Amino acid sequence: MLSRAVLALVVLLPFSPNPAGEYSKHFGALSKLSIAVAEAMPPDQYGFRPHTESMNFGELIAHIATTNYQFCAGLKDSGPPSLPSPIDKDADVKFLSDSFEYCSAVIPNLTEEQLNKTHNSPDGNLLGREVLLALYIHVAHHRGQAEIYLRDKGIKAAVL
């Protein structure tokens, strides 16, 4: 009986889920919600800042995009690609969308070794799993800020 169990494991092992599957399965929703928030703000309000010490809305969206690239490049142990300097809503939304696409090409392909290895990130040297957690927290934190900017302008935040 034990040999059947071992045989079953040998046969099924190649079909086991990707080690990063637990992270990548939620990344689509994170991306869609964030892009929807960026798209919800009217172009003429991208310079809005709720407080003089706050980033304006466009800067906040660009900040999310920039750090997405930095976190995901760190997981590849490389520097981020050259990044644009968006000047309007369309450029900011594209920058954000492209950053999520970049990460979407990295995250599902991470190996168990990469998840357990230390990588450089905007939050310092972290294990790959911690880099992913920091990425998700960072996006959620700043997307939440962006939703407050929308509320200040009387705009309903996006919901999936």
Regions found by a protein language model. Name each.
Residues 4-13:
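Sec-dependent N-terminal signal peptides
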Residues 16-24:
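Short, low-complexity N-terminal intrinsically disordered segments enriched in polar/charged residues
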Residues 24-28, 32-35, 45-82, 120-160:
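Short, contiguous alpha-helical
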Residues 37, 87-120, 126-140:
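Acidic/histidine-rich alpha-helical segments that form the ligand environment
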Residues 41-42:
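Membrane-proximal, proline-rich intrinsically disordered regions
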